A protein has these predicted regions:
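Intrinsic N-terminal pre-sequences and regulatory tails
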Residues: 1-13, 112-117
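Short juxtamembrane and helix-loop transition motifs at transmembrane-helix boundaries
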Residues: 1-7, 25-34, 53-61
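Extracellular/lumenal glycan-associated surfaces
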Residues: 11-31, 43-53, 69-86, 99-111
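Short, aromatic-rich membrane-interface segments at the entry and exit
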Residues: 33-40, 88-95
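A cytosolic-side transmembrane-helix exit/cap motif
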Residues: 56-64, 113-117
């Protein structure tokens, strides 16, 4: 029995919903300019990554997608920690670290196989 219970289409749907949340957070939560710019860039990357999986002709292999997902999740966590220390902004830190941890959990729970085996 596999613990990876999230299918690729479900994973992509969650990312498509989550990416705008990450992009809107700097405006809604009042991040400083630098933290906001990085959050906006990470959200844009997440949206592009999600869109690359919903077409019949994937633009990147699923194994690469998994690697990019892990890297993006870790980058979001590190961004939250670095900017949290640099700016003393607990809201931005909590949001980015939490978002990155949730993305890491989603990535670890996803079956990266074309047929959902």
């Amino acid at each position: 029995m596999s613990t990876r219970s999230v299918s690729i289409p479900t994973h992509a749907l969650i990312e498509i919903i989550a990416a705008p949340v990450l992009m809107a957070a700097p405006f809604l939560l009042g991040f400083n300019l630098a933290t906001g710019a990085v959050a906006l860039a990470l959200g844009t990357l997440l949206m592009g990554l999600a869109i690359s999986t919903v077409t019949d002709q994937r633009t990147i292999p699923l194994t690469a997608h998994a690697s990019f997902d892990y890297a993006l999740a870790v980058a979001t966590i590190v961004t939250g920690l670095v900017f949290g220390v640099a700016t003393s902004d607990p809201v931005a830190t909590a949001f980015l670290v939490g978002f990155g941890a949730a993305h890491l959990a989603l990535t670890a729970s996803t079956r990266y196989s074309a047929r959902g085996a």
